[in-house]
Amino acid sequence: MIGRTLTATCTIQSVSADSDEATIGQIHGQSSVFMLLIYRPANHDVQVVTYTINGGSTATRATVVTGVNLGDTITYSIHYSGSVVTTVVNGVTNTYSVDSSWAGTPVYFKLGSYHAAPNTGNPAGDATKVSFSAFSVTP
């Protein structure tokens, strides 16, 4: 993927009590994650997490917007082109340089409701729930 943009509008209804964040968008390589867009309800913020080296476990986090509560609308776009990723979250734009280890790596966008809570042993109804009202991937 070279020069594509994921645009989405979502509302986060809940985040599992066993998790402290919910991933609402990402760029993923064939075997490793490249970039995550994460909502953290305790901090009322949205962060961008970028994995510095392809296949590595070192990541950097940057808070991109604050004051976001459960039930609020989050509108975002993630644009990846060449050696740059640009995010726009609720109107706030940030740009990130991409390490050369990602050059030529096939990647794809993912959106949804991903959380770090265990998949078993959770009380009934304890879930991360995100609704998307719009999304698109464009060149």
Which residue stretches match the model-derived regions?
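Secretory/extracellular carbohydrate-interaction modules
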Residues: 1-46, 138
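Ligand-recognition surfaces built from glycine- and aromatic
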Residues: 3-7, 17-21, 67, 98-139
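Short tryptophan-centered beta-strand motifs in secreted/extracellular beta-sheet-rich domains
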Residues: 8, 72-80, 85-87
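Short, surface-exposed beta-strand/loop "edge" segments at domain boundaries and coil↔beta transitions
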Residues: 30-36, 54-60, 95, 116-126
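Short hydrophobic/aromatic-rich beta-strand segments that constitute the beta-sheet cores
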Residues: 48-50, 87
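Short, aromatic/His-centered strand-loop micro-motif at the edge of beta-sheets
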Residues: 50-75
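Short strand-turn-strand beta-turns centered on an Asx-Gly dipeptide
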Residues: 88-92
